[in-house]
Amino acid sequence: MEEGELKIIVERIQDPDIDIQNNALNMLFDVTKSSHSKSIDTINFQYLADNLDVLEDVCKRLEGNKKRWLCDIISAICVVDDERKLLAYRVEGNIIDLKEWGHLYVKKLIGCIADVKNNKMDFPFAKTRDVGRECIDFLFKHNAEFEAIDFLVEVGGIETVLDYVDTHNYNRIVLYLEDMNSFVDLEEVILKIYLKMGDHSRYVVGLIRRQKSKEAIEYVRSIEDRDYKKQCLYILARCNLYYEASDPEEKYILSNGYIKDVYREIGAELEIDKPSKMDAILKGFKYDKDTRQLASIGIANGFVHMGYGRDPIFLPQEGDSRVPLDYEAILGCDVPDLISVFGSIGVIESWNSEKVMETLQEHIFADFSYRKTGSLLGLALSGLRNFEERPAILALLSNNLQSSSSIHVIATLLGIEAMFSGTQAEEVRELLQPLMFSDSSEVVFFTSFTLGSVFCGSADEDLTSLMLQTFVEKGKESETQFFRFLMLGLASLFYRRKDVECGIMEIGGALSKHESILIKGFQYVGTGDSNVIESILTDSFTGDTDALLESLGLLSCALVSMGDETSSQMVGRIVSSSLLLDSSHLRSVLPLCYSILYPSNPQVNVLDMLEKSLNIGETNCIISTIVSLGLIGAGTLNSRITKILDQQYSYYYKDSKVLPVLKIAQGLVSLGKGLLSISPLYFDKTTFMPKNTIGLFSTVFMLLDSSISPLVSSHAYMFFLLCQACTQKYVTCSEKINIRVGHPINTVGMVGEPKKLSSVQTHTSPVVLSEKIRAETDENVCSSYIEDVLILKKN
């Protein structure tokens, strides 16, 4: 429009004739609207902005809707110039529909309201509420949910999003809020959205993620739809949550009785149920006279055949290939290695404690011996997730705690820890608390770890006080390896409890600073909080060099970064950069950090780094690197890791410390023949399982000084800590369905319904998923998470 025409419109607005004035206002509206529709017509806006004082004078003389109409027009004109007037006139007018001005104007308007909220603009915030509500309406109606959510978070009104969620935008909104939840606590709003939309699986998982286990159980009990309830029961069972149910089917699912049947059916369907040959693990083993390798071979064999109920050594079936091992001769020698051997039988029969009881009955009810202790450990490991059998198994284990030998008591405690980790079972407290006053320091320290693991995340005051007292009284033994179990137990109590302070620094004593750093790592597990990482590194690397403190600092940073891709990469670079300090303890801790960051998730650059670590020549570094290769490759059958480990045999076949861990690492790579993982993250990698996290971290933590670690020197059976970290990585369904698998695409903030997977392949269930792969299906299943066991919703 020509400048002259604009001039006439401005003049006519001042005309006393009402009709002329109305026409001029309508023309001004049309000009302003057309300028907005062209993004911004600078010529029109510039002229109108220069004559804004004239329009403002006219506005003062007008009344009623005409005045409000002109206020809105003036507000729209101010979009290129005066933000305060833009907001003030819109608040005064607020009569013209926002869609007339378009998205750019609304975006500018919400920016002004946010500035008012943050005291960057002098204007009463209360007066902006109606305008803000209209802006939110506009944004949600025009598929700009993400800008609306950003605005609501900025002004502290995120609860309003509940009014706008529907089936059309639900997935986009939830995905965006879940991603934003890493920076702002939006969990309560997200849970309310799940509840509103009737998304049972996400709601239950959300409660579990918030450590609201009781609410999750009560909600599942209240679900009336049979199929959805059944699906949520599988979720509870997977997260080790149990309640007494009268329905036999509910009881069967909740007690994890289904795992054995489903797991073995999938193994048979994939034709991997027959025993593996294990040539690499048995290489160089002399069956007739070599008993020193029994423990490591038993553990490795247990990991490979975990859950299948058959193997080539102890439990072969008719027609299976067998290892020519004299089983009777093994039973004849009562040596500590038998704890690992019999424990491995329980691992092979995982989720089938009845069979273990039948197989090892004569040893379980015998007098104190390594055979009995190993059999009890095996029984506990077989009942790791079976809630029905726990009371009976605990009763059998409790008798063995009366032994005068610490190795028997510790192995029994390991079985109790594996079964009850994360359950906060009071019967375990009553049973174990007297052992905190045992004459054996090793028993005291391992009891602390067991209690910490059982009550992880509870911040229990009585246990905290008891462990702090032990921490001070046993300070003289802080240099021993078993003292670290006390440190682990105390830290476990504060798992993901940022709201509680331990007070370890106030009591002082040896390793109090070390413990405070470990506790901070546990408090912020998986948050990826860069400020916490910076704080830990500052505390660890300031002052004189302290090998344990620096190692703990890096491990705690890895713990904080678990599950967060960006943070994991950052900490990975920090850890690799620490090698520039040229310290042997940092060279040893590097592979351990990687095994926390990438469990069952081999990365090419990480394997390159670990392969170089094997050439350093320091025993500590070699052992921690070999175990880390096993942890990173656990259950992946990764050919490169297998090749690297095979190559090490020719160097270390005579090394009594390296060879056992080499065999165990080889067993880990073939964990469950590829059906199992040790990743502690469930449900699209959003939810940490405390039991799995503690099982993984405690194994890694106890390898800090690996050449003198109990796991390497005298207590090899402690590698069974990893059993509680094992989880099935298959997807199966109550009926055969098509499942698409592929690499996940980050669709956060994308409009419409973009594809969520790339490199897609379609398979019929069951399907095995690696760490980098996700699944989806078009079938009407009862879960939003395509993992584990799915229930097909019947029409």
Swiss-Prot record:
Top-level lineage group: Eukaryota
Keyword Nucleus listed: yes
PC repeats by residue range: 374-410, 411-445, 447-480, 624-658
UniProt KW keywords: Cytoplasm, Nucleus, Proteasome, Repeat
GO process terms (BP): proteasome-mediated ubiquitin-dependent protein catabolic process
Stored Pfam families: PC_rep (PF01851), RPN1_C (PF18051), RPN1_RPN2_N (PF17781)
Keyword Cytoplasm part of the UniProt annotation: yes
Primary location group: cytoplasm
Locations listed in the record: Cytoplasm; Nucleus
Gene Ontology cellular-component annotations: nucleus; proteasome regulatory particle, base subcomplex; proteasome storage granule
Quaternary structure and partners: The 26S proteasome consists of a 20S proteasome core and two 19S regulatory subunits. The 20S proteasome core is composed of 28 subunits that are arranged in four stacked rings, resulting in a barrel-shaped structure. The two end rings are each formed by seven alpha subunits, and the two central rings are each formed by seven beta subunits. The catalytic chamber with the active sites is on the inside of the barrel.
Family, similarity comment: Belongs to the proteasome subunit S2 family.
Functional note: Acts as a regulatory subunit of the 26S proteasome which degrades poly-ubiquitinated proteins in the cytoplasm and in the nucleus. It is essential for the regulated turnover of proteins and for the removal of misfolded proteins. The proteasome is a multicatalytic proteinase complex that is characterized by its ability to cleave peptides with Arg, Phe, Tyr, Leu, and Glu adjacent to the leaving group at neutral or slightly basic pH.
PANTHER family given in the database record: 26S PROTEASOME NON-ATPASE REGULATORY SUBUNIT, 26S PROTEASOME NON-ATPASE REGULATORY SUBUNIT 2
Protein name according to UniProt: 26S proteasome regulatory subunit RPN1
Organism: Encephalitozoon cuniculi (strain GB-M1)
Chain's gene name: RPN1
